[in-house]
């Protein structure tokens, strides 16, 4: 059984160098889970931050589902608590505060047991010349593949 990807943060892979990945649970209300199942989420400007020793997903947009509750509209960009083991939290805290790295959400998905999970990563920001070098390498690879594909014997 495969995972069901809800939202991906493609901008994170472009702007950051991914060093290490983690899988975290996320605290959601029932209406938010319904919205995720309808794939109404966006991680483009999302980031993670420590608040009182706990890790929160900030600025992630989970849209309000019209059929869920008409009388209560929650904040779509509310901070959402991420669930990790204590040792993982300590490791992330050290990496962020001592090494100056950032924690970036990569995707929200439902795992095999239908639990909503967030894939987060410890990342280091790329400089402009690094981004250009990556884009150049990708275009060269793409051109080489098309040349090999169109090659006649």
UniProtKB/Swiss-Prot annotation:
One of its GO terms (molecular function) is RNA binding. GO terms for biological process: trans-translation. It comes from the Bacteria. InterPro entries: SmpB, SsrA-bd_prot, SsrA-bd_prot_CS. GO terms for cellular component: cytosol. It is found in: Cytoplasm. Keywords: Cytoplasm, RNA-binding. Belongs to the SmpB family. HAMAP family: SmpB (MF_00023). Required for rescue of stalled ribosomes mediated by trans-translation. Binds to transfer-messenger RNA (tmRNA), required for stable association of tmRNA with ribosomes. tmRNA and SmpB together mimic tRNA shape, replacing the anticodon stem-loop with SmpB. tmRNA is encoded by the ssrA gene; the 2 termini fold to resemble tRNA(Ala) and it encodes a 'tag peptide', a short internal open reading frame. During trans-translation Ala-aminoacylated tmRNA acts like a tRNA, entering the A-site of stalled ribosomes, displacing the stalled mRNA. This is SsrA-binding protein. The lineage of its organism: Bacteria, Pseudomonadati, Campylobacterota, Epsilonproteobacteria, Campylobacterales.
């Amino acid at each position: 059984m495969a995972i069901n990807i809800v939202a991906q943060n493609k901008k994170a892979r472009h702007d950051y160098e991914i060093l290490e990945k983690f899988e975290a649970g996320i605290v959601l209300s029932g209406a938010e889970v319904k919205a995720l199942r309808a794939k109404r989420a966006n991680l483009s400007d999302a980031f993670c931050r420590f608040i009182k020793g706990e890790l929160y997903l900030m600025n992630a947009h989970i849209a309000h589902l019209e059929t869920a509750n008409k009388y209560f509209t929650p904040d779509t960009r509310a901070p959402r608590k991420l669930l990790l083991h204590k040792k993982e939290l300590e490791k992330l805290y050290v990496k962020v505060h001592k090494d100056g790295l950032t924690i970036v959400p990569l995707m929200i998905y439902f795992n095999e047991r239908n639990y909503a999970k967030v894939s987060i990563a410890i990342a280091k920001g790329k400089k402009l010349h690094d981004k250009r070098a990556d884009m150049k390498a990708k275009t060269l690879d793409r051109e080489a593949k098309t040349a090999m594909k169109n090659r006649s014997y």
